[in-house]
Every structure is written in structure tokens, then in C-alpha cells.
Amino acid sequence: MSAMRWPAPAKLNLFLHVNGRRPDGYHELQTLFIFLNHGDWLEFEPLTDTDLLTLSPAIPGVPDEQNLIIRAARLLQARLPSQQGAHIRLEKVLPMGGGIGGGSSDAATTLVALNHLWQAGLSEDELAELGVQLGADVPVFVRGKAAFAEGVGERLQPVELPSAWYLVLKPDCHVATAAVFQDPDLPRDTPKMALHNLLEGEWKNDCELLVKKRHPEVANALGWLLEYAPSRMTGTGACVFAQFEDEVAAREVLAKVPKGWDGFVAKGENISPLFAALQQVSDWGIAKR
């Protein structure tokens, strides 16, 4: 079978509330995920009669045993009745440590694409169960629908959000998720609320104040973006975003971004580009960009 390209889209947390800390150290959260039509691309060339996995280009400083793409492929290999491998090529667009799901999205795309290409036959639920072993955000990418998430992020309720465009800025810093959740200054007492109340209320990110204090670059980006539209941080950062009604308005602000800052404009999607690609493959047997 020839190589096939699959999208690994970005996500935004439109709000992120930390409701408490569990005895096992994980945090109880409430958050709202939406996908963007912008992200990495992964090309898979299936191999038969071998369990060889190769990834190019290698990600500097990330050995295979820590790479989520390789780890996802190996989890799926363990469920196969016969040896299958793959050459994988990564077109990296999303920043690491940005809070827009780069590594989690790559892992989910690997699970979904190789499940199809290897004809593994795992259900969406089974793929999501593999995904949560790699990270709390992986299941939402596997399921491919905008969602309200609770627990540690594993309880997902699909939602339909209004069409919107987003300007995303990536400050010049890397924020480690584990460090944020381990910080004693992180607020952990936001009361849990029903989804309909959350959708009608003011959206916030409980990690934002802490990250702004630890990373002035994030504070600077938010301060600049707030001059043009209500803005928040996504996930544990470092990316920040603002919502606009149309692409033109978002691009007008992007054109004013200070020199040296990275940013992009993307449309919010209730259905992940990965899910759309899977449907296309199922219907026509091909994946197109």
C-alpha cells in the first residue's frame, strides 16, 4: 500500500477549570475542546511481515521511548494478530509546549490512521482507551468531535459550537504541563458547574494567572491581544488566542503582530479534520489534504 497523509489538527481549550486534586495526584477538570483547521501532517507507509517502525525527521531531544507517535504505534502493534510496521514522516507545524495539542494530536492520528491502514479493526472506544495511556487529551482527538470534558479529561460530551475564527499567538517560551499542575500556587477550587451554566457564563483558564507569573512572554502576548479582542490562554500554555466572527477580522489583527512573534489564523471546527479524513478514506479509499 502506498503512503498516505493524515492531518493532526490543533485544539483550543475555550475554558479550563481546575476543580480539585485527587488522591492519586491527578486533577479534576472541566474544559471545552474545539478543533482548528490547522496542524501537523503525518504520512504513513505500511510495512508487512515486520514490526519495524521508523519516524522521520527525528524530534531533537525526544528518544523513541518518549515519542508519542512511536508509543502510539507500538500500543496498536500489541493488538495485532500478525507483524506489521510503518515508515512514518512527520510534517511538524504545531509548537511543542504550546497547549494546542501537538503531541496528543500526533498520537491520536497515529492510532486512527494505522488502525485503518493495518486493518486492525479496533473500535473508537478501544482506540480511546489506548489513547488515554498516552495522555489525557488523546481521546478527544481520537473521537474527533468538539467536546465538554470532565474528570481528568476522559469523560467527553460532544457539543456543537457556533462558527468562529481564531487568532493564535505562540510566545517564545515552553510551558511544561506537569510543572503547572505540580505548582502549589495553582488554583484548584473552582466549583463544578453544569454544562449549560458554563456555556452561558464567563470563560476563564485557571492556569493562566500562574503561567503569566512564571512566563512573562505569555503575559506580554495576552496583554497585546487584549487590545483587540477578549483573549485567553489555551491548556497550560504557552499559546494564547482570541476569537473573531470572521477570517478577515482575525487576519487584520495578525498583520499587526509585533515582529518576531509567531501566530496563525484558523477556523474552529466541531468535527476534527482527522475524523473528516477517516470518513473520506472509508468512502473513497484515499486521504487527501
From Swiss-Prot:
Positions annotated as active site in the UniProt record: 11, 137
Catalytic reaction equation(s): 4-CDP-2-C-methyl-D-erythritol + ATP = 4-CDP-2-C-methyl-D-erythritol 2-phosphate + ADP + H(+)
Alphabetical UniProt keywords: ATP-binding, Isoprene biosynthesis, Kinase, Nucleotide-binding, Transferase
Gene Ontology MF terms: 4-(cytidine 5'-diphospho)-2-C-methyl-D-erythritol kinase activity; ATP binding
Enzyme class: transferase
Pathway(s) this gene product operates in, as recorded in its UniProt entry: Isoprenoid biosynthesis; isopentenyl diphosphate biosynthesis via DXP pathway; isopentenyl diphosphate from 1-deoxy-D-xylulose 5-phosphate: step 3/6
GO biological process terms held by the UniProt record: isopentenyl diphosphate biosynthetic process, methylerythritol 4-phosphate pathway; terpenoid biosynthetic process
Binding site for ATP: 95-105
Domain of life (superkingdom): Bacteria
EC number in record: 2.7.1.148
InterPro entries per record: GHMP_kinase_C_dom (IPR013750), GHMP_kinase_C_sf (IPR036554), GHMP_kinase_N_dom (IPR006204), IspE (IPR004424), Ribosomal_Su5_D2-typ_SF (IPR020568), Ribsml_uS5_D2-typ_fold_subgr (IPR014721)
Function in brief: Catalyzes the phosphorylation of the position 2 hydroxy group of 4-diphosphocytidyl-2C-methyl-D-erythritol.
Recorded family membership: Belongs to the GHMP kinase family. IspE subfamily.
Protein name, as recorded: 4-diphosphocytidyl-2-C-methyl-D-erythritol kinase
Species annotation: Aeromonas hydrophila subsp. hydrophila (strain ATCC 7966 / DSM 30187 / BCRC 13018 / CCUG 14551 / JCM 1027 / KCTC 2358 / NCIMB 9240 / NCTC 8049)
